[in-house]
UniProtKB/Swiss-Prot annotation:
This is ATP synthase epsilon chain. It comes from Vesicomyosocius okutanii subsp. Calyptogena okutanii (strain HA). F-type ATPases have 2 components, CF(1) - the catalytic core - and CF(0) - the membrane proton channel. CF(1) has five subunits: alpha(3), beta(3), gamma(1), delta(1), epsilon(1). CF(0) has three main subunits: a, b and c. CDD domains: F1-ATPase_delta. Produces ATP from ADP in the presence of a proton gradient across the membrane. It is a peripheral membrane protein. Keywords: ATP synthesis, Cell inner membrane, Cell membrane, CF(1), Hydrogen ion transport, Ion transport, Membrane, Transport. GO terms for molecular function: ATP binding; proton-transporting ATP synthase activity, rotational mechanism.
Length: 138
């Protein structure tokens, strides 16, 4: 079976490097499905789930946004923050979401609102992954 090499890299570490059957990433225009021999492209990522499918199963990684570079035999995902789905802490995510909502309610500066909206978007994407994982386990 044909494979494609995938690297997922954050600002602090390499989270994944290996041969996969396919990878799905949250592009700014919608979910991007990448298979071996894919056409070369460069796309912006929004906060969400990167799903890596191998012959052993599926691995999920949260990315806070970033860039995906696709070549026919290599996919590289760069993100400031990348966290394995199993390492997401629901309590911390809920705290961050509440903090962002409180800041939105109390802020009048448009720059503050913009940054707070980004933080809220990241928290919501993380919660969506946590809830999806919980659904898989039941």
């Amino acid at each position: 079976m044909s494979t494609i090499h995938v690297d997922v890299v954050s600002a602090t570490e390499s989270l994944y490097s290996g041969e996969v059957l396919c990878v799905f990433a949250p592009a700014s225009t919608g979910e991007l499905g990448i298979y071996p021999k894919h056409t070369a492209l460069l796309s912006i990522l929004k906060p969400g789930e990167v799903r890596i499918e191998t012959d052993k199963g599926i691995e999920s990684i949260y990315v806070s946004g970033g860039i995906v570079e696709v070549q026919p035999d290599v996919v590289t995902i760069f993100s400031d923050t990348a966290i394995r789905a199993n390492d997401l802490d629901e309590f911390k995510v809920l705290e961050a979401k509440q903090r962002a909502q409180d800041e939105m309610d109390n802020s009048i500066d448009t720059q503050d609102i913009s940054a707070t909206q980004a933080a809220l978007s990241e928290s919501m994407a993380q919660l969506q992954m946590i809830n999806k994982m919980r659904g898989k386990k039941c």
